Amino acid sequence: GGGGEPDGPEGPAPLPEGAGEKGAEVWADLVERGVEGFRMVLAPPEYYQRPLEFRMGVVGAASVDHLCKSIVMENTRAPEELQGCEDPTYSKYYMVIVQYTAKLNAEKLKSFVHGLAGGRLPKKKINMRLVSEEVNDRLTGFAHNAVTPMACATQIPLIISHKILALSPDFFWLGSGEVDLKVGFSAEKFIQVYQPYVADCTND
């Protein structure tokens, strides 16, 4: 902050009752890293069976475009020596954050990953696919529909769709470690803290 003035009077948003162990870890990660103004909402069990308009109402999102998800992608053609994700510019895995209303574009993602690698990875050695459930669980520690960058078991390099940064108001929603827990925050604050790459990675 500027000049060390105290935090706002509100402090962090409360952890919803019944948020679960993983949800508590995500909450603690956000608080520890100083992500201000986030909100957590416990969704009803039928959340994923219902349309986006229903989900928007549950969390209080400004529009269906503000509902986003984190997907772990794997380069299935990565060379033998490329196994992990220690180097964010040269990684076998990326966690990509996109809107539910947008479709991830594999070719755009491939081009972006190719650019990050700076010549170390020829395009024919890139084929980005959704990871299997088993790999997802091992890398993230989260179940399907609960994946999130916060408190993730492995530090997977992050890519966020540039469209999320253009949302107005600047407050988007993500999974939060448990299937029925959602978290919302400003893209600007999220980027400051978690420092994802910003990419044009969805269909126009």
Where are these regions (language model features)?
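Extended, low-hydrophobicity, polar/charged segments
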Residues: 1-204
